Amino acid sequence: MQLYETPDNRAPKGTEVYAARTRNNMRIRAMTAPSLTAESKGTVVILNGRADFIERYFETMGDLQSRGYHVAGFDWRGQGGSQRLLKDPMRGHIRSYREYDEDLRAVMDGVVTKNCPGPYYAIGHSTGGHILLRALSRQTWFKKAIVTAPLVELQYGPWPKSVAFFLAAMTTAFGFGWCYLPGFKRPPFLFRGFDNNPLTSDAKRWARDVRTLENNKNLGVGGPTYAWLVATILSFKDLHKRRKGQGLNSPVMIILAGRERVVDNAASHRFASAMPGVSVVTIGQSLHEIMLENDTVRKEFLAVFDSYVG
C-alpha cells in the first residue's frame, strides 16, 4: 500500500505506510509520521469521514507535527486505499458499524501503539467522529478526543427518519442493499464541481483534492448504498442508547460548522447535553469539512485544538 502525493500536497515528513489487518483479514491502509519538534507531546490519530482518503489530511497532519505531535491516519474499509467490499469499488457500502470498530482496533493495536508514543489523542471527522464516539464508549485508548461535524444524525430532507429507515431496510432485506440510494451516483462527490459546495468554501483546497483523485481514481468512492443507510441508522440508535446508559471513557470536544448542510447540528447539541464530559464549540463561518476549509476557519480550528489538547 502507498500514499499519493501531488506537487501541492506532500505527505508529512517521515511518513511510514502500513497495511493493517483486521481479524477477518481486511487490508486497511494506514500511516504514521513523527513529531517535528525535539520533544513529543504524544500522538494524534485522525479518523476521516465517509468517502475520504488519507491524502486530504496531509496539511492538517503537518500542522500537528509542527506542534509536537506524532500523527497517524488510515482509510476505513471500502474507501481510499483500503480494501473494497463490493465488485463495484465505487459504492459506499457497509453492513454494520461493528466492521468500522474492527478497522479502528486493527489500526490502534497493529500500528499506532506499536509505532507511536503516547499519550494518544484522536480527531474524528463526520462519519469518523461517529465511529470515534462509539469507540469512546468501549475503549480507553485516547486521553482526549475532538470530533468535527460529527455524524450523530443525518439531515433526511423530505423523508421522516422512520420512513427512510423502513424503505432502506426493506430494500436491503430483498437483496438490493448494494444499490445506490436515490439521488446518489457512482462518480465521487469531488468530481461534481465546486458551485454550491456543501463541504467547504475553499476552492483552492477543493481543487487540490480533486487533482489527487484525478491522478489516483482508485481512491474515490461514490454515493452510499441502502445497506450503508440501514447500518448508519442502527448505529445512531446504538450510540443514543449508550448515551442514556453510560458516559464516555475520555473527554470530548465537539466542533460544529455554523453553515452545516450535511449532518444535524441540533442532534450533536442534544448528545452533548446528555453526556458528561462533552463540550461543544461552533465555528460560525465553516461548512462541513472544517479541517479543509479556508485559512480563517482552519485557524479557528487549530486554536480550539491548542486550547483543548495543548
Question: What is each of the regions a protein language model found here?
Answer:
Residues 1-21, 26-36:
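An N-terminal hydrophobic leader/cap segment in hydrolases
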Residues 47-52:
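Active-site glycine-rich loops that stabilize anionic/oxyanionic intermediates
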Residues 54, 61-87:
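Conserved alpha/beta-hydrolase
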Residues 92-112:
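Alpha/beta-hydrolase active-site loop
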Residues 127, 132-220:
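Alpha/beta-hydrolase-fold enzymes
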Residues 248, 254-256, 260:
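Short beta-strand/loop motif that positions the catalytic acidic residue
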Residues 250, 264-273:
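Short alpha-helix in the alpha/beta-hydrolase fold that links the catalytic acid
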Residues 278-310:
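Catalytic active-site module of serine/aspartate enzymes centered on a nucleophile-bearing elbow/loop
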